[in-house]
Curated annotation (Swiss-Prot):
Protein name: Protein COFACTOR ASSEMBLY OF COMPLEX C SUBUNIT B CCB1, chloroplastic
Transit peptide: 1-44
Disruption phenotype: Seedling lethal when grown on soil. On agar plates supplied with sucrose, seedlings grow very slowly with a chlorotic phenotype. Deficiency in the accumulation of the subunits of the cytochrome b6f complex and lack of covalent heme binding to cytochrome b6.
Gene name per UniProt: CCB1
Recorded GO CC terms: chloroplast; chloroplast thylakoid membrane; cytosol
Length: 267
C-alpha cells in the first residue's frame, strides 16, 4: 500500500477512476464495457494511423518539391506513381502518332476516286430528263464536257476550301499543343517554351491552300434497258462530288438502302 502512494500520479486520473468503476461492476457488465472500449480504441487507431502517414508523406513531398521545383517527372517517380521508363514510353508512342496528322494533311490535297452504281428512285423519269439534271449539276460546279461518247466525261478544277484549311490548322494546333505538354513533363529544362511549337500549326493550312487546286474528271455512264427506261447510272470520280450528285439527284446506290442522317433535312 505504501508503494502505491509513493508512485507518481497518472497523467489521466479519469482513466484510473474509470478502471475502479469497471472493476466494481458485475462480471458480464465488466466484460461488455472492456470489449466496447477495445473496439473504440481499434477504430481510433485505424483512423489516426493512416492520417498520420498521409500527413508525414505530404510534408516530405512538399519539402522535396521546394528543393526541386522543376522536376515533376522525378517527383512522380519518387512517390511511386510512374517511372521514368513509363513516361518515355508514353512519349515515344505519342510522337509516333504524330505522323498520322501529317498523313491527314497530305490526304487532304488528294482526291479519293470511287466507282459507284446508282438507281433512280422515280421510275417515271425519262433518261433524257435524268441526263439533263446531271449536266445541270456539273455545269453549276464549273465542270465542262470533254467526251460525249457512251461514257460522258466531265472535267473541272477543284479549288481549296477555307473551312478545310481552318480545320486542318486547328487540328494541327491541338496536336502540337499536346506534344508540347508531354515535352514539358518529360524534358522540364525548357519549361513552357515547348508550347511555342504550336506556332507551326498555320503551315498546315498554307500547305493545303497551295496544294488543293487540282483538275478532276467525273465519268458518267447511263445504262438504258430494253424498254427504254433508265436502269443504272455508273459514276466514277472524286467521292465528294459523287456524293453531292447522289444527294441532289436523289439517287440510291445499287444494293444499298439509304438512311437519312439525324441532321439531314428531309426533302
Amino acid at each position: 500500500m505504501a508503494t502505491k502512494l509513493i508512485s507518481p500520479p497518472l497523467s489521466c486520473p479519469w482513466v484510473t477512476s474509470r478502471e475502479v468503476i469497471i472493476k466494481g461492476l458485475p462480471r458480464r457488465r465488466r466484460e461488455w464495457m472492456v470489449t466496447k472500449r477495445n473496439r473504440v480504441s481499434a477504430v481510433t487507431a485505424m483512423i489516426v494511423e493512416p492520417l498520420s502517414v498521409v500527413s508525414s508523406s505530404a510534408i516530405q513531398i512538399h519539402q522535396w518539391w521546394e528543393q526541386n521545383p522543376n522536376s515533376l517527372l522525378l517527383m512522380t517517380e519518387a512517390t511511386g506513381g510512374y517511372s521514368l521508363a513509363s513516361y518515355y514510353t508514353s512519349l515515344g508512342l505519342f510522337v509516333i502518332s504524330v505522323p498520322g496528322l501529317w498523313s491527314l494533311i497530305k490526304r487532304s490535297v488528294k482526291s479519293k476516286i470511287v466507282r459507284k452504281t446508282f438507281v433512280v428512285n422515280d421510275v417515271k423519269k425519262e433518261p433524257k430528263q435524268v441526263a439533263g439534271e446531271i449536266l445541270s449539276f456539273f455545269t453549276r460546279k464549273n465542270f465542262n464536257i470533254t467526251d460525249r461518247g457512251e461514257t460522258i466525261t466531265f472535267e473541272g478544277k477543284m479549288v481549296p476550301s477555307r473551312g478545310q484549311a481552318a480545320l486542318l490548322t486547328f487540328c494541327t494546333c491541338i496536336s502540337l499543343a499536346s506534344v508540347g505538354l508531354v515535352l514539358t513533363i518529360t524534358v522540364p529544362d525548357f519549361g513552357n517554351n515547348w508550347f511555342f511549337i504550336i506556332l507551326l500549326s498555320p503551315l498546315a493550312g498554307v500547305y493545303y491552300w497551295k496544294k488543293a487546286s487540282r483538275k478532276e474528271e467525273i465519268k458518267v455512264k447511263m445504262m438504258v434497258g430494253s424498254k427504254g427506261r433508265l436502269d443504272e447510272i455508273v459514276v466514277q470520280g472524286d467521292d465528294v462530288q459523287v456524293e453531292e450528285m447522289r444527294k441532289e439527284l436523289q439517287l440510291n446506290e445499287k444494293g444499298m438502302v439509304y438512311v437519312k442522317g439525324l441532321f439531314e433535312r428531309s426533302s
